[in-house]
């Protein structure tokens, strides 16, 4: 699908824009902690909520909000045609899962570290890697692990197949997610404190190494991606 784009403008008004570069979005107007990232080519909505040198925005593909520095305004371009979500059947998604897995394995081969809020390579957080992997084939997932858990079709651990998502956390909430590879293994981006400070492969077993065992003790369940996310803010 093609979009008609207007020329660059330094101070965009409220409306929909396309990112011309990879951009950082922050979780507060102070812009001290990364919330997420927007890869070049993504669409975002600039709201009327301006505070000093930042503006609140939300990403059109996943409805995720954050704060954007006005210094990044020159990396936005107005879109005259709104973002339109693609639709996929379950069978179409199934055929694309080998490419989703290949994306994560290629990402693991690059020098990387765990980055909270990271969705743009080479550095990702857990759910950012999952979102980027599926987005690489045009399928959009919600941004955070708990949102991805709620979005997928619940399955049992015994039903796991390559390309399914595996969720970890507490009894109250999913705080971590990985992509199942088959034969008990999954790939994920994990942090320094509990994980590998980057992308690695672990096993769903009490017999694995310390990292695998730690996550296995927090295993919540699994989910199957059966559709692409459709924006709710329109």
Sequence positions of predicted segments:
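Aromatic- and glycine-rich peptidoglycan recognition patches
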Residues: 4, 14-27, 181-234
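Catalytic cysteine-centered active-site loop
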Residues: 112-162
């Amino acid at each position: 699908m093609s979009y008609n784009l207007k020329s660059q403008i330094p101070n965009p008004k409220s409306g929909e824009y396309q990112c011309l570069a990879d951009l950082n979005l922050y979780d507060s107007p102070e812009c001290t902690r990364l919330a997420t990232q927007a890869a070049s080519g993504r669409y975002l909505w600039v709201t009327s909520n301006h505070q000093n040198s930042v503006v609140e925005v939300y990403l059109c593909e996943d409805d995720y909000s954050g704060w954007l520095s006005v210094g990044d305004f020159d990396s936005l371009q107005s879109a005259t045609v709104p973002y339109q979500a693609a639709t996929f059947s379950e069978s179409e998604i199934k055929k694309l899962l080998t490419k989703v897995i290949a994306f994560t394995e290629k990402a693991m081969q690059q020098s990387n570290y765990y980055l909270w809020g990271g969705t743009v390579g080479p550095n990702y957080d857990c759910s950012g890697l999952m979102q980027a992997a599926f987005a690489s084939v045009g399928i959009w997932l919600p941004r955070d692990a708990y949102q991805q858990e709620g979005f997928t079709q619940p399955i049992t651990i015994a039903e796991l197949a390559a390309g399914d998502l595996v969720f970890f956390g507490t009894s109250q909430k999913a705080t971590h997610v990985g992509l199942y590879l088959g034969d008990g293994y999954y790939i994920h981006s994990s942090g320094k404190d509990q994980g590998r400070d980057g992308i690695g492969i672990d096993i769903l077993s009490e017999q694995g190494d310390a990292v695998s065992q730690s996550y296995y003790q927090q295993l919540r369940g699994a989910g199957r991606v059966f559709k692409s996310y459709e924006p709710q803010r329109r």
